[in-house]
């Protein structure tokens, strides 16, 4: 995982007793901004440490920079691992896939790149209330019953109907107006 992961990821690591393998994001020499994670560094980590079970990438990062998720997904799956993308600041990307192309930048939404699990914070770049988010299971690789069990342990038994309603309204608006 990148060292630029959200603090909730670090909390999950502690709860799960998981020791992370860190990959430092590239830094732009001119601006000092963090760039995306280098797919070759991810592959090197997977080759070096056979105990790695999943790879987590934050894309876009806090500066809006996207990693090459398609290439990373290909590498991670070649090594038989799960790819999780924290796309908290990129929930809007699936509505802008038409931007891909001329400049060669990886504009595609992680959900369309073969990623196994994608977390979207819909309140950051879409239209839902603060605190609303979606956990997308995009392939059959993740253990969905186990994920559901863990979520039941951590989530409240009294969900916010305001947040759920805002997610419904958000998806309705985007379905009608999103193109």
Task: Spell out what each predicted region is.
Residues 1-179:
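Conserved PLP-enzyme active-site core in the AAT-like
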